[in-house]
Regions:
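Mature catalytic core of soluble alpha/beta enzymes
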Residues: 1-326
Length: 326
């Protein structure tokens, strides 16, 4: 028998993990409502994804570049799926550009515009074709550097889903990782949709939103934008989403991309790939994965895939919704 609304307690918490503010809302029928789900995210970061922590599997893979490295079933599964997205996006998403990301260090203490020679040098050590996966054995060509940061929060959300599925008293949940990665679990007690705000890429105030996306049941949302980490030099915006083919911040004409699908990893990786690809090519990639998406361009136009048209409500008056060219 389903629990009535009167039987359900609501638990909210705000914490910090994966270098961002994490807010959670749980609907539970049990007494122990303190789930500490952020501990799951910290474990993913520390033991799986970090490229600076020696405990991390990614750290070990990078340290052993040029050699075979044994990895867990979990990481092997993630890598297999990410390499497929890299291939399907023609390298617009590429998990091997770790050196390039650290060269620019956008959002870090040493952010800069690198010399052309520096960029060419690190690009020689990147390329998803340089990593080979055979079961639980991974081999990267020497000098290659793995960085799963573009899918990290999504992977964290996938792990949280597994954790929530073990908690019988939790009937629904919302996890928001800094606004860029959101997951919903189950249905709200009142049966309404989960409404998630999408940032206006050129908002003057943090509370100015582009619009709202409705999520239903268990779904994952990821947003990639040129406003998250960037600096401006000589009137040029240098943001953190790199085009692996050029070694420079992507210039596809879009300022933000939001993707909704049934996997955190895919939502994260696809939003990055679509930002690099732009509206038309990005839309085709989303179709291949059965994902919904919205694209925002530099001229304040919003482009919605067919599935996103049923989810999205525009709030910002300075934007207009346009059709995607076939």
């Amino acid at each position: 028998m389903a629990a009535s609304e009167n039987d359900v307690q609501t638990y909210t918490d705000t914490d910090f993990a994966m270098d961002t503010v994490v807010s959670e809302t749980l609907y539970t029928t049990g007494d122990d409502i303190n789930s500490k789900l952020t501990a799951v995210l910290t474990d993913v970061e520390t033991n799986l994804l970090s490229w600076t922590n020696e405990k991390s599997q990614i750290y070990k893979v990078n340290a052993d570049s040029g050699k075979d490295t044994e990895i867990s079933d979990e990481l092997s599964g993630y890598l297999k799926r990410l390499l497929k997205i890299a291939e399907d996006s023609d390298g617009a998403f590429d998990p091997t550009i770790g050196k390039l990301i650290r060269l620019w260090d956008i959002g870090g203490e040493n952010q800069k515009i690198p010399e052309e020679a520096e960029i060419k040098n690190v690009l020689k050590d990147s390329g998803y074709q340089k990593i080979f996966l055979d079961g639980n054995t991974v081999h990267m060509e020497e000098g290659c550097s793995l960085d799963l940061g573009a899918a990290g929060k999504g992977i964290g959300c996938d792990r949280i889903l597994k954790e929530l599925e073990t908690k019988k008293d939790v009937i629904a949940a919302l996890m928001n990782l800094g606004g860029s990665s959101v997951m919903t679990y189950g249905s709200k007690p009142d049966g309404s949709s989960w409404n998630v705000a999408v940032t206006d890429p050129r908002a003057e105030n943090e509370d100015d939103y582009l619009g709202v996306v409705a999520l239903n049941g268990t779904e994952f949302l990821s947003t990639s934008g040129d406003y998250e980490k960037y600096f401006i030099e000589n009137a040029v915006r240098y943001h953190h989403i790199m085009d692996p083919s050029t070694g420079y911040p992507a210039e596809s004409g879009v300022t933000g991309v939001t993707v909704v699908c049934d996997s955190g990893l895919e939502a994260d990786a696809l939003s990055t790939a679509c930002f690099v690809l732009g509206v038309e090519k990005g839309t085709q990639l989303l179709k291949a994965y059965g994902a919904d998406g919205l694209f925002v361009d530099e001229d304040h136009h919003v482009y919605l895939t067919e599935g996103m048209k049923e989810r999205f409500s525009l709030l910002a008056d300075s934007y207009s919704v346009e059709d995607i060219a076939e």
